[in-house]
Curated annotation (Swiss-Prot):
Described function: Catalyzes a reversible aldol reaction between acetaldehyde and D-glyceraldehyde 3-phosphate to generate 2-deoxy-D-ribose 5-phosphate.
Record family assignment: Belongs to the DeoC/FbaB aldolase family. DeoC type 1 subfamily.
Keywords for this protein: Cytoplasm, Lyase, Schiff base
GO annotation, cellular component aspect: cytoplasm
Protein name: Deoxyribose-phosphate aldolase
Record's catalysed reaction(s): 2-deoxy-D-ribose 5-phosphate = D-glyceraldehyde 3-phosphate + acetaldehyde
Organism placement in taxonomy: Bacteria, Bacillati, Bacillota, Bacilli, Bacillales
Disulfide bonds: none
EC number(s) reported in the record: 4.1.2.4
Amino acid sequence: MNLAGMIDHTALKAETSRAQIETLCKEALEYKFASVCVNPTNVALAAELLKSDDAVKVCTVIGFPLGANTPEVKAFETQDAIKNGATEIDMVLNIGALKDGDLSLVERDIRAVVEAANGTLVKVIFENCLLTKEEIKTAAELSVKAGADFVKTSTGFSTGGATVEDIRLMRETVGPDIGVKASGGVRDFEGAKAMIDAGATRIGASAGIAIVTGGTSDSDY
């Protein structure tokens, strides 16, 4: 198992500095992580720093962290991020619409990003800690229907992160051909392995180095 190649090495806090992005990218190249996951304002810098190695992708977040932008705004964010060098897109779905049962809006929201991405890989963030199990299942079904490539547990900025139980449910719902990303609270090798054993194919974490070296981090993301 190439664990490093399953990790999105992440720095999404509001106070993230240029120096921290430089360190993040240097570490991603050294450990050969799947991607760096950064806020849209840092995409161009990350793309420049990683241009020597196409294997490390530049992932960014859309409608983050609330998911409460309109589909049109999320589509523009997506196009702008790709123009700036993003090669993977993690979007937050419309959580309020899902809770309201407005499933047509949820699907349209996801589809708007998928279409704007135009072939660039799209992951859909659910924020499972705010959802019932049935809502998680519905979100997964709508993500597949709208053409997303991955489903993802959490932003890391709400009341809870990834759980083994939720990863199993998401994997069972989407089947074998869609990626499942565990994010939020994965801090060490044991935690990452538990998520992978449950069906995760990607781990989002700021604790990537601790995970691959057998250490432990106190990071919430």
